[in-house]
Amino acid sequence: MAKKGTRIVVTLECTESRTVPSSKKRSAGVSRYTTEKNRRNTTERLELKKFCPELNKMTIHREIK
Protein backbone atom coordinates (compact mmCIF):
# COMPACT_ATOMS: atom_id res chain seq x y z
CA MET A 1 0.00 0.00 0.00
CA ALA A 2 1.32 3.43 -0.97
CA LYS A 3 2.18 6.06 1.63
CA LYS A 4 0.45 9.42 1.83
CA GLY A 5 2.23 12.12 -0.14
CA THR A 6 4.13 14.87 1.63
CA ARG A 7 2.53 17.60 -0.49
CA ILE A 8 -0.90 18.85 0.57
CA VAL A 9 -3.27 21.44 -0.92
CA VAL A 10 -3.81 24.47 1.35
CA THR A 11 -6.04 27.54 1.09
CA LEU A 12 -4.65 31.04 1.68
CA GLU A 13 -7.02 33.82 2.80
CA CYS A 14 -6.44 37.58 2.89
CA THR A 15 -5.95 38.90 6.43
CA GLU A 16 -7.00 42.50 5.70
CA SER A 17 -10.26 41.84 3.81
CA ARG A 18 -12.24 41.03 6.95
CA THR A 19 -11.24 44.19 8.84
CA VAL A 20 -11.81 46.77 6.06
CA PRO A 21 -15.39 48.14 5.76
CA SER A 22 -17.24 47.24 2.55
CA SER A 23 -17.39 50.90 1.45
CA LYS A 24 -13.59 50.91 0.98
CA LYS A 25 -13.52 47.61 -0.97
CA ARG A 26 -13.68 47.24 -4.70
CA SER A 27 -16.09 44.29 -4.38
CA ALA A 28 -17.71 42.29 -1.59
CA GLY A 29 -16.05 39.11 -0.38
CA VAL A 30 -12.72 37.68 0.73
CA SER A 31 -9.73 36.89 -1.47
CA ARG A 32 -8.61 33.24 -1.41
CA TYR A 33 -5.85 31.36 -3.21
CA THR A 34 -5.06 27.64 -3.29
CA THR A 35 -1.51 26.31 -3.36
CA GLU A 36 0.54 23.29 -2.31
CA LYS A 37 3.03 22.99 0.51
CA ASN A 38 5.43 20.30 1.63
CA ARG A 39 4.30 19.01 5.02
CA ARG A 40 7.83 17.95 6.04
CA ASN A 41 9.64 21.21 5.21
CA THR A 42 7.03 23.72 6.41
CA THR A 43 5.14 22.40 9.41
CA GLU A 44 3.85 25.81 10.53
CA ARG A 45 1.13 27.77 8.74
CA LEU A 46 2.05 29.35 5.43
CA GLU A 47 2.09 33.16 4.97
CA LEU A 48 2.58 34.71 1.54
CA LYS A 49 2.22 38.21 0.17
CA LYS A 50 -0.29 38.04 -2.69
CA PHE A 51 -2.51 40.46 -4.63
CA CYS A 52 -5.97 40.97 -3.11
CA PRO A 53 -8.45 41.95 -5.86
CA GLU A 54 -11.01 43.07 -3.25
CA LEU A 55 -8.68 45.76 -1.85
CA ASN A 56 -6.72 46.24 -5.10
CA LYS A 57 -3.31 45.93 -3.38
CA MET A 58 -0.73 43.42 -2.13
CA THR A 59 -1.62 41.93 1.28
CA ILE A 60 -0.56 39.04 3.51
CA HIS A 61 -2.49 35.83 2.90
CA ARG A 62 -2.43 33.17 5.65
CA GLU A 63 -3.19 29.49 5.52
CA ILE A 64 -6.63 28.50 6.82
CA LYS A 65 -7.90 25.08 7.85
Curated annotation (Swiss-Prot):
Listed GO biological process terms: translation
Top-level taxon of the source organism: Bacteria
Q: Which cellular component terms (GO) are annotated to the entry? A: cytoplasm; ribonucleoprotein complex; ribosome
Q: Which GO terms describe its molecular function?
A: structural constituent of ribosome
The UniProt annotation puts the region (Disordered) at 19-40
The coiled-coil segments of this chain are: none
UniProt keyword annotations, A-Z? Ribonucleoprotein, Ribosomal protein
Q: Does the keyword Ribosomal protein apply?
A: yes
Entry similarity comment: Belongs to the bacterial ribosomal protein bL33 family.
Q: What is this protein called?
A: Large ribosomal subunit protein bL33
The source organism is Prochlorococcus marinus (strain NATL2A)
Whichever gene encodes this chain, its name is rpmG
